[in-house]
Swiss-Prot record:
Record flagged with keyword DNA repair: yes
GO molecular function: damaged DNA binding; DNA-directed DNA polymerase activity
Domain UmuC residue range list: 2-189
Organism: Salmonella typhimurium
Protein name: Protein SamB
């Protein structure tokens, strides 16, 4: 049996935890550069606020009650996600972090001591009392059925946020699947659901009763696996340790359009520096560094320009200095004056677990001395936050930095921002 714990309205809920005055208020969190609404609290959803609505439109709209908006506070959300993970691990033997707000749990054998749904309610209370966040819990003999159960626990309030689908109660499973639209099934996207609809498959139950061989022939092995999972055959195991990444991408839209080479070089240096940090976090080395730049495709009065260039190193590296140097060389090959650039990024590929490679007799490139020790010191100083020490190439206070004018304090990662309680 698997359980899926999903934090309700995660980003908005994190903002509410440290602001008791917002407990029953409408809260939304904005995307990068305070562009549009992404997460919404339950109260905001009741007001009819849609995901993706631009903030400038929402700001001038009239509602029966005020809507409080926050810029995305990624450090806070990552910290709170880790707290939820720790609390789940205190009650479950094996936990897989599927996303920042979703965790799969291995709950095999739990029912020999306690009813599955009673255990789900224990999980909810343990996380709520320890973090202030509310989770929904869905349980099933497969990951896909656990995901469907979790969907139903949100869809119908009578379940109290907890629902278990077991092999001993097939009628309940079939009833739920008959009510679940096919596009709500885990792993079934919009494109696949449209094709399924043309075949007369509109619900999860109809997909579960489809012939797996037919599904594999007309779609792919992934959807066939989904069909088997809907029928209680576990095909997707728990992954306590995530597989090694095959690519690292660091990119961001600019808060202000970039028009000068110097500003773009600073941005590329910052993205390369962050990508190198992530690479070392994966304990990997890379040989391929790419940089891309592009203008806004929506600026109808300006010509569009986008390009990408890459550099391949003779020796795999995880040294920020090497990665920045390669990224700047790539930028030099694609930079064109006269454009108003909206976005840039750095990509790392071709990973290896060691920095060893076979050099030719006349190769002049040699590994940097004490590179690993220097990077360890650098990462140690910057841990657990970012920006304590950085390379000068990224500048000091660039104007193009991402806009976060409504950013909440770093309640859990900065001493100065720890909330103070006063007794009166």
């Amino acid at each position: 049996m698997f359980a899926l714990a999903d934090v309700n309205s995660f980003y908005a809920s994190c903002e509410k935890v440290f602001r008791p005055d917002l407990r029953d208020r409408s809260v939304v969190v904005l995307s990068n550069n305070d562009g549009c609404v992404i997460p919404r609290s339950a109260e905001a959803k009741k007001l009819g606020i849609k995901m993706g609505v631009p903030w400038f439109q929402l700001r001038s709209a009239k509602f029966p009650e005020p809507v409080i908006a926050f810029s995305s506070n990624y450090a806070l959300y990552a910290s709170m996600s880790n707290r939820v993970m720790v609390h789940l691990e205190e009650l479950a033997p094996r936990v897989e972090q599927y996303s920042i707000d979703e965790m799969f749990l291995d709950i095999r054998g739990i029912d020999s001591c306690i009813d599955f749904e009673d255990f789900g309610r224990q999980l909810r209370e343990h996380v709520r009392s320890g973090t202030g966040l509310t989770i929904g819990v869905g349980m099933g003999p497969t990951k896909t059925l656990a995901k469907s159960a979790q969907w139903a626990s949100k869809e119908w309030s009578q379940f109290g946020g907890v629902l278990a689908l077991t092999l001993h109660n097939q009628k309940r499973t079939e009833k739920l699947l008959s009510l679940q639209p096919v596009e709500e099934i885990w792993g079934v996207g919009r494109r696949i659901s449209k094709k399924l609809n043309t075949m007369g498959i509109t619900t999860a139950l109809q997909l579960a009763r489809a012939n797996p061989t037919f599904i594999r022939k007309n779609f792919n092995v992934v959807l066939e696996r989904t069909v088997r999972e809907l029928n209680g055959e576990s095909c997707i195991s728990l992954e306590e340790a995530p597989p090694p990444k095959q690519q690292i991408v660091c990119s961001r839209s600019f808060g202000e359009r970039v028009t000068t080479y110097e500003a773009m070089r600073q941005a590329v240096c910052q993205h390369a520096e962050r990508a190198a940090e992530k690479l070392r976090g994966e304990r990997q080395f890379c040989r391929h560094i790419a940089v891309f730049v592009k203008t806004s495709p929506f600026a109808v009065t300006e010509p569009y320009y986008g390009n990408l260039a890459s550099e391949k190193l003779l020796i795999p590296t995880q040294d920020t200095r090497d990665i920045i140097a390669a990224a700047v060389r790539a930028l030099d090959r694609i930079w064109v004056d006269g454009h108003r650039y909206a976005k840039a990024g750095c990509m790392l590929n071709d990973f290896t677990p060691t920095g060893v490679s076979q050099l030719n007799l006349f190769d002049e490139v040699q590994p940097r001395e004490r590179s690993e020790q220097l990077m360890q010191v650098l990462d140690g100083i910057n841990h657990p936050g970012k920006g304590k020490i950085w390379f000068a190439g990224r500048g000091i206070a660039p104007e193009w930095q991402m806009k976060r004018e409504l950013l909440s304090p770093a309640y859990t990662t900065r001493w100065a921002d720890i909330p103070a309680a006063k007794l009166t």
